[in-house]
């Protein structure tokens, strides 16, 4: 079996024009694995730490040359000569090399880039798709896309406090047909916004960022767009929100839509929304530091709607385990760079599934052309993916890769559609 011959890191750019880490792992056979690490705008306090240079003379302090040096130095030295096929063993070496809880010594960006590149190199050497390498022959389920078509919060410069308004196409019996429904709705949304005199500029994730007056106005416009596209809201296409409420939570109070609100008032707000609109999923409805609020909303709405912990769990199995024990949330957003290795990410997904929590594989707002998460979604049979809107190549790349995977799987491909949310009555 071929061994690792070369590990090489370099500084490249993400979709926001910020530096990020790319890693190449080459095997003795010539097989090559390459990976680029994404970065987030609204980040959880407990996320693994991406290492930035802090030199104001380069990229406004956001350079990643230190992380790149770590790849080319200490990491390369540790991995060259090893076989790449035991992902867990490789990742454990990386974790021990770093030696910190949050991967702050070498940088989660250096560690994750290497972890992903090793997996790709091994898959390429074996001549199998990455999803098959990660998930074996059991990876065959194509995910429902949660498409962020209206941006607010930290992802846009407008009045909307909710960070993402998503359409969730569940129709058609195949990923390609659900994607088509989402894309057609996106184009009709653009027409409606133009007719109403709103901007159709797009935000970080390819969604529109109009200066709407309220969350309800955004949801009303989405309902119109779905109908204009010829689909039925609540049947063909559902809705989802990423509130990212940690962004406006301070001293026990939510400063939301011009008012200071308690946890109880926020929960009442969500209750009204899910009665009025076909909302199937709400991400980070409560702050990552408001565990009592999370317990209450899970008790009240947990059988009606998917309650997703992102900032709450930061893809960390230890924190997820605590959430499960305390009855907090019923789903987890999974982001590779929140935890920092492929193995730990797979562990988190496995734990979620064992305890009947949904797992949604997710991009970051600062993305790249890398399509690793498309393969991860299929490998884990996660059933849901968040990878932005129907514009910007960094988002479309993931959808196109899923189309290729669906084609490759042929009759073996499965798309659950509405059944992904069978547990919820909203």
UniProtKB/Swiss-Prot annotation:
The record ties this protein, via CDD domains, to: enolase
Quote the pathway field: Carbohydrate degradation; glycolysis; pyruvate from D-glyceraldehyde 3-phosphate: step 4/5
Q: Which Pfam families match?
A: Enolase_C, Enolase_N
Q: What is its EC number?
A: 4.2.1.11
Q: Which residues bind Mg(2+)?
A: 242, 283, 310
- What residues bind (2R)-2-phosphoglycerate, as annotated? 163, 335, 364-365, 386
Query: Which residues of this protein are catalytic?
Result: 205 (proton donor), 335 (proton acceptor)
Signal peptide location: none
Q: Give the protein's recorded name.
A: Enolase
Species this protein is from: Aquifex aeolicus (strain VF5)
* Gene expressing this chain: eno
